[in-house]
Regions:
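A short, conserved, highly charged catalytic patch centered on acidic carboxylates
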Residues: 1-96, 103-140
Length: 140
């Protein structure tokens, strides 16, 4: 068992869970993702089927920004994995998708205007997920 700090409960330490816990730690510690804006095992409905996104990262206004799909290290990241996360994105319409098996990581940025996506060379910092908007306090 391992304590999932986001779900605040102990969960079975499966190979996939090991990948999730390390990846979440990386996002929070090295990429500046706020722990309070990440949800693990988020339930969604795709068509008539209930599914669970492994992790969803939210913006400060509670809008979903990123879906992360984890696989155990011995599972290859095949087209089937990308198809799975794409189905989840049909519901959430995020700009960022990540698939990881702990050994390989792929980050994609959606390009909805051109109905395609781009593989990114690195996983973005949290501040790179959305254009920053600065508010001048005199305009409020």
């Amino acid at each position: 068992m391992v304590l999932d700090p986001l779900r605040r409960k102990y969960v079975a330490l499966t190979p996939e869970e090991w990948v999730r816990q390390h990846f979440i730690h990386f996002l929070i510690t090295h990429k500046g993702y706020p722990a309070g804006l990440i949800a693990n095992e988020m339930a969604i409905t795709v068509g008539t089927t209930r599914k669970r996104c492994d992790s969803v990262v939210f913006g400060r206004q509670a809008q979903p920004l990123m879906i992360v799909e984890y696989k155990a290290p011995h599972i290859a990241l095949t087209q089937k994995v990308f198809d799975q996360i794409s189905r989840y994105n049909m519901r959430l319409h995020v700009d960022w998708l990540i698939v990881s098996n702990g050994l390989q990581h792929y980050c994609l940025r959606m390009d909805y205007a051109h109905r395609t996506y781009h593989f990114m060379p690195d996983i973005p910092a949290y501040t790179e997920l959305t254009p920053s908007v600065s508010l001048d306090s005199s305009s409020i």
